Amino acid sequence: MQNINKFTEVYIFVPSITIRRKLPYMESRVKEIDYLKCIFITLMIIFHLVYIGDKYPYAKQIVYTFHMSAFLIISGYLANNRKDARSFLRKFLWIFIPYACMEAAYTVMSHFLPVRESVDAITPTVLLDKIFLHPMGPYWYLHTLILCSLIYYITFRYVRLSVVSRLVVTGVCLFALSHWGGLMNFSNALYFLIGMTVSQSGLRFTQVFRATTFAIVPFVILCCFPANLDRGTLAGVAITWLSISLLLVAYGYLPVQAKRLSFFIGRNTLVILLFSPIFTILSKAFLPVFAFDPTGMLFLVTP
């Protein structure tokens, strides 16, 4: 999809001065972003397989440092605060209803099946707690996305301040929900805020996250120290940033068919995320078949 060179003019009012900014018109799909979403959702599924995660614990630590962080940056960048309330509510429910259904199903499943996150009893209170307050499994991402998107929309639609001031207000609200409300991890919300900031800057995603092979050196150095493998640290932010840059380098070398496949997967990450726990549970049935392979690679690549 070609870049669109149209611009939308917006005005930011600050005391005593009016600043006129131009924001690039957001394309409906950005190929590089779909590609990145494909890579990150694939990494999520791979390392949610307990068998693979246990065989490669350090690789799992590295991947867990950046894959969902990058997802949240992309989500913040793509979040649309220019919709009217009706359209926003429709989009909000389009995410919340599947999330609530799958989170409830996952909670019930965790009571009956031998999973790492187990639930002692299934009651309406437990279900409401998991859906609205303390989600289980991979659905914490959707829970965080819903809360961050809601705060972002309210702040940028109804607060009459400069863009910088509204970003600060959004950050304070997210911190309050995290620190005092206990509804999410602030380090996760911070990545969404980074994506918001990039979007509000008017720069294209690939202008901020540039493809560069030089990123490999600091990426490897940072990943050599276990203390850096925490997305809640500055090192974690750097690893996330560098991973995006490196993956964009690889994007330039992909054959056309591989790119098309990545675009398709990237456009359907919500469905994949929703049903990923079912896949990971069913895959356990094949463990005895591939027990002879000490690397676990046959188990990983066999459909």
Where are these regions (language model features)?
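Alpha-helical transmembrane segments and their immediate juxtamembrane cytosolic regions
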Residues: 5-303
